[in-house]
Each structure stands twice: as C-alpha cells, then as structure tokens.
Amino acid sequence: KWILVCIYPKAICEMIDIIGIDKMGIMEVKDMLVHCENALNVLIDTSRLHYIRPILRNIISFKSRLGNNDDNINDYEEMLEAIEKLFDKFGHERELFEWYPYYVDCEFCCVNELIAERRCMTGISIEELAGDTQSSRNVQRIIKGYVSPSYNTSKKLLDRLGLKGVLRSDVIVGSGVEAYETLDKALDCIAMSKFEDAERLISQLRTMFYSNVEINNIVLEYLEIWLQMLKDEVEFSEVVNRLESLLPFKYSEIGKYKYLVKHERMILSTYIECLGKMEKYEAIPDYDKMTSWITNELSKKQFASIFEDLNMRYANSYGNAGHYEKSDRIAEEGIRIEIECERMHCLNTLLYCRAWNAGERGNVSENDKELCRCAYEIAKLKKQNIRMGLYRRWLEKQ
C-alpha cells in the first residue's frame, strides 16, 4: 500500500486528465470510478491526502455522469469543500508533484551517533562494548565517527546495547510483511476503540515475532499496557510506572538523548497522555525539550509521524491546562506539517484542538467552525464514529 499510495492516486488522475471525462463511454466511466474509489481507500488506509482533491472531484464527476445524485455524492462534495478550504487557508495550492523521502516519513540517523549515545545511556565501557569480536581501539574510532562500521559490526554493537534487531525494525522485527500489517491494524483498532479486535490482533502478533528480540517483547508489553489504560482497567499512576520500566532511561532524563527508536517515542507519547488525564500538567516535560532533536523544517518532515503525534498530545495537554495560546501555536504547526506532507494521521484532532480552544475562550469565529467541520469530515472519511460524534456535538453548541 505504501508503493500504491505514492503512485496510484496520481496515476489515475493523470490518466483521466489525458483521456478526458467527456470523451469516456459509460463503461469507461464505471471502470475509472472504481479506480478512483480504490485510490481513495488506499489514502484512507494509509492516512494520506496525496491527490485527494482531484480524486474526490473525479468521483463526483463520474457519479454525476452516471446519475448517482444521492446522499453518497453529497458526502464527497462536503469532504471536498472542507479539504479545499483547509488547503487554501494553509497555502497548499497544488498536489505534491512526487513524494520525496521526507514526505514518506523516512527517518535516518548515523549509526555511529546512535551507538555512541546508547553507550552513554547504558554506562557500558568501550572494552565491554568491544567484547571479544572487536578491538577497543576500533570501537572508539566508531564512536568518535572516524570510521563507519559495517552492517555486521553495527549489528553486534547494537545487540550488546540492548537494541537487537533495530537495524531491521520499524517499531517491531517481524518474520514477514504480515507482522507489520497486523501491527498497523492493531493500532488502527485501538484508535477506533475496537478493543476486542485489537486484543485479537495483538495475540496474532505474538506468533509473528522473533521472541528473542527484546524490542518485540517491549512493544507487546507496551501495547497491552496502553490497551488496559484505554479500557480503564488500570490506574494512570500505575501505567506511568509500568511505562517507565520499559524505557532504558528515567523520565527525568527526557530531552537528554536525541536518538530514540520508534517504540520509545511511542511510550513517551503515552506517558504524556497519562499525565494529561491525571491533570498533572506541571509534570509534563517541556515541549521544547521533547522536540530539541528536531532542528529544522526538513527534520519536521523527516520525522513527521513522531512530530505530528507530539504536537497533537502537547496541543491537547496545554489546551486542557488553559494555556490556549501555546496550544494554538503547537496545533497550528502540526496542522501545517500534516498538510505540507499530505498526511492525515492526527489532522482531525489538531483541527478540533484549535476550535475547542476558541470555544473555551468564548470567541468562536466562523474560521473555527470551518476547522471543526473539516475535522468532522476527516473523521467521517476514516470511519472514526466516536470522534465524529464529539465534533458534531461541539458544532451544535455554537
């Protein structure tokens, strides 16, 4: 689907532009409508906005051509109107010509720096890290960045630092692509509060993991803790303590380390969420400290999934604490990056946060209502019924 989402929506729209809708026969219209609907489903499955405007326009045109003027076509028209207004507001005039690596949330770091930082984090000596397979002198040169280690050398050093499998991982290390798809589905089910489905998928994951890879076991335990928290089966204070035990450093050291792996950032995000639910806003680590490793505009896109998630959680927490201006600034930045990267993972939450802040201040503008309407349309597109209800109730109050 990642390959499809980069190519399929754009390719379909370009073909339609070349052929021309007016020149298509009824059978061609039906075929291309199916392609457009499939392309839209790929965007929904991957939470992307790449070419969503022309896709929606074509679906509306094809349905009108076929005489399908029902409620279904109105849904597409409302979605298109909301997206166009949002893109216009943030100056996103045209679709990205193509996706460069940083738009696909491709994050890289120098393995030398990761090894050096982890050595400091764990307190292991150079001699212990070298073991009986490397010379201490060579390891020291690697840590200082004088030489680049081979894959095998990197693997051995990272194994000793508790990061076995990290060179192959994207959160987890699975035995095949099915494991990564199952993890994505489990996370989606949790987001949509489909807890029984999430538990079933997490059980399936256990059979797809390499159990001797430590990060896999950490991710499984994290998912179980997170699920218990969302189901109100455990106190937030207990969740905070259990999450800290999964990290290789203390909460007090947040901001000290730059190169964290994905599951560690996921754990920290849930930690922030817990503190917010406990209303311990003063204990939440400073936003600038949490994002100190994001040094420029490009790195915001390179680490888009992490950056958008942090912005969502901090915007919500600061808003709940009554720091509306700070919340607005963070939410606005998150929305901008989501739109520039044509993503919609956290977009509806960030949009609603801006509108909610305005409501709490008692000065809701038409622009705030438009933001919430767009949040509603995105939630509707992604079939997030609970969030749809939340956004609808807010709009009805205004």
PLM-predicted stretches and their roles:
Residues 2-19, 53-64, 176-185, 214-230, ...:
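Amphipathic alpha-helical repeat scaffolds of TPR domains
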